[in-house]
């Protein structure tokens, strides 16, 4: 009887850890009452991705500029949204790549200033302003791993990092100079670069934390203006609705020595341990 009770407890714990690892790293609640306008020069937006079809951009023109509330000083840069329209009964997934500071529509709590390509899916341009839209956040359908670039004009003593090609937004970027023992958190600027004012010549580690609390690490040999690296990982989007299918987890840059350490790694370890124990108990029962 005691063994049976233990077995049931273990089974419950196992299911708990399964459901824990399948929680989307951000809220996907449906928001209604959103509106949209369009603009025609979406390149070089405030999120720092430059040309949308260039190396830092999403590789397509399905983007939006967010009003101050949604833009949130850059915190929603790189977030993707699935927006549905009652005008066409269609939906479109866009990435936030810009801010929309204009007084007027952009000051609403949920307003998207869309590229014409995205707007056209949701309604005719002649309508001007689309009202009554609904949306929810979704992971971005990017290919390969999270990437990092050091800002134009970086030098041995100052740099700023742009994190891009991520499926989810970034909560924190920290730097540890080689030989030091602690990471220092950087400040995210409103133009989406993480400012690192206390660099020294030589190598350093960067720790990138997703909004879901998952970490990606990369070692960079030295500060170099506009130098880009692909890390060896992508953030997990297990449990998210609207996860785009397609290739993911491409090849990492072999020279950078990046690695990943995640809470879900820990919970799957727990899972394996619990499974082994459960099987052990089953064997003992027989
Ligand atoms: C969209 O769907 C609603 C509800 O099903 C329907 O009444 C409306 O005619 C549809 N509109 C278009 C443009 O298809
Ligand atoms: C966007 O949301 C709508 C409504 O929930 C859904 O039907 C559609 O499949 C979603 N699109 C994508 C690409 O996830």
From Swiss-Prot:
Gene Ontology cellular-component annotations? membrane
Question: What's the short name of a Pfam family annotated to this entry?
Answer: DPBB_1
Which CDD domains would you find in this protein's record?
DPBB_EXP_N-like
Cellular location of this protein? Answer: Membrane
* Leader sequence segment: 1-21
Family listed = Belongs to the expansin family. Expansin A subfamily.
Q: Which residues are glycosylated?
A: 82, 89
The keyword Transcription belongs to this UniProt entry's keyword annotation: no
Q: Which SMART domains match?
A: DPBB_1 (SM00837)
Q: State the InterPro entries in the record.
A: Expansin/allergen_DPBB_dom (IPR007112), Expansin_CBD_sf (IPR036749), Expansin_CellWall (IPR051477), Expansin_EXLX1-like (IPR049818), RlpA-like_DPBB (IPR009009), RlpA-like_sf (IPR036908)
Sequence intervals crossing the membrane:
266-286
Q: Source gene?
A: expl1
Q: How does it sit in the membrane?
A: Single-pass type I membrane protein
Name of the protein this chain belongs to: Expansin-like protein 1
- Describe the function of this protein: May serve to lubricate the movement of the cellulose microfibrils during cell growth and wall extension and/or they may serve to maintain the fluid state of the slug cell wall.
What intrachain disulfides are recorded? Answer: 47-77, 80-140
Annotated Expansin-like EG45 domain ranges read 44-145
NCBIfam families recorded: expansin_EXLX1
Q: Which domain of life is it from?
A: Eukaryota
State the PROSITE patterns in the record. EXPANSIN_EG45
| Alphabetized UniProt keyword annotations | Disulfide bond, Glycoprotein, Membrane, Signal, Transmembrane, Transmembrane helix
The chain's Extracellular topological domains, given as residue ranges, are 22-265
């Amino acid at each position: 009887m005691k063994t049976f009770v233990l077995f049931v407890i273990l089974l419950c714990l196992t299911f708990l850890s399964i459901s824990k690892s399948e929680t989307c790293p951000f809220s996907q609640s449906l928001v209604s009452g959103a509106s949209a306008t369009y603009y025609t020069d979406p390149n070089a937006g405030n999120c720092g991705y430059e040309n949308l079809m260039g190396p830092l951009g999403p590789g397509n023109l399905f983007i939006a500029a967010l009003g101050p509330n949604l833009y949130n000083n850059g915190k929603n840069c790189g977030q993707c949204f699935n927006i549905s329209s009652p005008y066409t009964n269609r939906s479109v997934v866009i990435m936030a790549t810009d801010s929309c500071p204009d007084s007027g529509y952009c000051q609403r709590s949920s307003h998207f200033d869309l590229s014409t390509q995205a707007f056209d899916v949701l309604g005719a341009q002649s309508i001007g302003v689309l009202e009554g839209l609904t949306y929810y956040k979704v992971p971005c359908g990017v290919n390969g791993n999270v990437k990092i670039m050091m800002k134009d004009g970086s030098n041995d003593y100052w740099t700023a990092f742009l994190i891009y090609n991520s499926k989810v937004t970034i909560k924190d970027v920290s730097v540890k100079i080689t030989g030091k023992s602690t990471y220092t958190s950087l400040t995210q600027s409103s133009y989406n670069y993480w400012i690192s004012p206390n660099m020294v010549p030589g190598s350093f580690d960067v720790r990138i934390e997703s909004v879901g609390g998952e970490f990606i690490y990369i070692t960079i040999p030295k500060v170099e203006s506009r130098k880009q690296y692909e890390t060896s990982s992508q953030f997990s989007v297990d449990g998210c609705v609207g996860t785009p299918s397609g290739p993911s987890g491409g090849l990492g840059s072999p020279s950078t020595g990046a690695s990943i350490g995640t809470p879900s790694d820990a919970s799957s370890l727990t899972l394996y341990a619990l499974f082994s124990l459960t099987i052990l108990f089953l064997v003992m029962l027989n």
